[in-house]
């Protein structure tokens, strides 16, 4: 009896265990993995559409796509775009194996519509991408199939722009960019690439637009734009491409020749920019300490603001230190009676952009500024510091000790590091902590030869805009040693503070420590400015090309890059464009090679500015694409087989 019960229990346990294993295998099957079998690497397959893909005379506004497995649509708002553009965003819903797109705008008669999903469609379990997919239909008798493709780059640094709209207008006058939505539209990917599909034969102009308000037209200076004067005539021809079938990562099986239709143009280059004269507004005014307050603006202006003091004369009591474009301005109070006030009351008139018209206008605001640290608090802190010093002196006196420590007081401070060595073509700069006058008789530049120091000629120049910044110009010679000496009280501020004595030794590096670079630019004219870059944002040197050359001397050894731009207005800086004036941003070029410069070496390079398209000019090290994971299938089964072979070989070695 016990034997029967035992055998019966074992039989049932065995069945239950087998069922559990089957269940675990079934649960593990989706996607499989190490090591429940091969991975699922098959992308989703489209089984059918309603209306039929490529259908004609379609009137319904609901589109249904059915796939062979459950799917997902990734970042639909960013990746999916309907052309002609829809002012009211279409609704995209996913349910299992089905995608439903509802077009909410009325359909235009006799028009080809495309729904470009880019690479957004993936299977729901493993995320295998379907690849770039576009659904299309026509509301008329004809389906337009032409395509226009290219890239969009930032005009100032040739960085590919992701997510900007690129559109076509069949009306060729400039005004349509501001007054009408695009006829056809696409959106760029992370590489700045776009492909506008469903284009009918005809003549077009192309535009790019970072559409801030969703109306598919250029609305204002805050929107990044690009435009081309070229008239585009789409065309096509039969072509072939070659597809290599690989056995593994090293060996290939065969090369297939695949016929396809080649659409032109396929290499448009649009350089996008924000217009010069961006909307200007007063961002904030801050008064952290009694002595000064600072105004911050969102954009530069050629016109400096004015202060109309309430209860004081701004013209005689304020000193102004500003940036070159008047976007940051600091006002120093030099009247001691004004400093003692807790509240500074004034009217401030400045140039701003009118919200309704977008035009520059003068605006006046009234302010009452109270410093975070009031003068009363400042005086209390000084009194407390003096009291501590006096007590310390008293303790030292009682111990019979003397002290050389001076009583606490405010001094004019120097900032700006003077390097121990300097190139012969550089100069010394320093910044003072507060507005001051300088007695140059108390400043000495000493040339040291052996152990003898002699006065060397120099020139001290205050900055044109920043009244705290100074430059010391000298007759520097390679290999020489100097000492800059500033006597005590040579600097006296508007608050009657003086400087402590200051000295700094430095040397002029010998020629052997530097590299030189000579760049031959056959297409250069007098408008070309060539920049030597230490990084994308750091301009090390800048010269204007002369006689087809740009020469750089006294370069510290290191890695560098070259950028150039056409300085048409001769202001030594890159300038943006203006659409209404038909003015493009100044053209930028990059030298495609990275330069490794060594000490005591002269390097010569020849640079043909237009030898490469913009997409291939920028050195790899400077390319700063917003890397998004490319939606391509992974060969995980190949990886799995390699891992299994690796483990097998390991077991054989151990055995």
What are the functions of these language-model segments?
Residues 2-655:
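N-terminal targeting or signal-anchor segments and their processing/structural boundaries
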